[in-house]
């Protein structure tokens, strides 16, 4: 399984969420609402989740092994870093 596309939208919030991403797996399956979170130990990826009636959050979709989780996290965070660099380059070019 490969992450074949990452679409990312940065968000400006007061909280720790920095972006929302959608990923395409093997050009056949899309997972939306993956969040990039600024945690105590740096950025990490949180899978899409839903609040249950008792207030807990349950993942809607998630990898079942650490290798797949790493692939997804690396792809999403690489796109997040790239989007940040593109934003800086755009601002340096005089656009605002």
From Swiss-Prot:
GO biological process, alphabetically ordered: division septum assembly; sporulation resulting in formation of a cellular spore
Alphabetical keyword list: Cell cycle, Cell division, Septation
Superkingdom of origin organism: Bacteria
InterPro entries listed in its UniProt record: SpoVG (IPR007170), SpoVG_sf (IPR036751)
A Pfam match: SpoVG
Cell division as UniProt keyword: yes
Cross-referenced PANTHER family: SEPTATION PROTEIN SPOVG-RELATED (PTHR38429:SF1)
Its job: Could be involved in septation.
Family affiliation: Belongs to the SpoVG family.
HAMAP family, alphabetized: SpoVG
Protein name: Putative septation protein SpoVG
Species of provenance: Oceanobacillus iheyensis (strain DSM 14371 / CIP 107618 / JCM 11309 / KCTC 3954 / HTE831)
